[in-house]
């Protein structure tokens, strides 16, 4: 009889143990899952925040570069409008050449500085190659009247700025070799009599822009 009672007591004890163990194990499993999920979610949020920061800082670097180019364009165009025309309102090409030469030499950021007249002909052009500015002789100046950036800039109002897409540079109707990607920043130019006389174009190297963007993202 005592053994039967003992067996009953052991069975009751086992039932009680299981009744306690199952909720405890379930609670432990839920806790472990919540802990793992919390860590994973924290890592995910941290990674996403880091990526957003990378993109934000790289975008800031890109915006800073573009803002600097626009500031340079406004500065040079204003200077040419004040100093680049005679009392009769006609272009003083030599004066504009010297202004452009000094500008591109000091800045060292631009592939070309150009003044195009109302017909789209280059009247002044300074290249920057091998670390030095180079004046382009009159017989080497080109007709750019069919180029999209000329037509779109000519349609602008005073104070408006044209910024081209990043594309390949074209010389004499052909893609320049070696390949050179550029962005063109341009504004209409007005003489001292308030008449539109052409456009000023800055060619900014796309490689420099992309390099600055990549450097900003990589250094974070």
Please describe what each predicted stretch is.
Residues 52, 70, 97-100, 147-150, ...:
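Extracytoplasmic/secreted envelope proteins and their assembly/folding machinery
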Residues 63, 67-97, 118-135, 219:
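Extracellular/periplasmic ligand-binding regions of membrane signal-transduction receptors
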Residues 127-203:
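Extracytoplasmic/periplasmic ligand-binding sensor regions of membrane-associated signaling proteins
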Residues 69-74, 104-129, 144, 155-162, ...:
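Short N-terminal helix-loop-first-beta-strand/juxtamembrane motif that initiates sensory/input modules
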Residues 93-107, 139, 171-172, 193-195, ...:
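Solvent-exposed, extracytoplasmic
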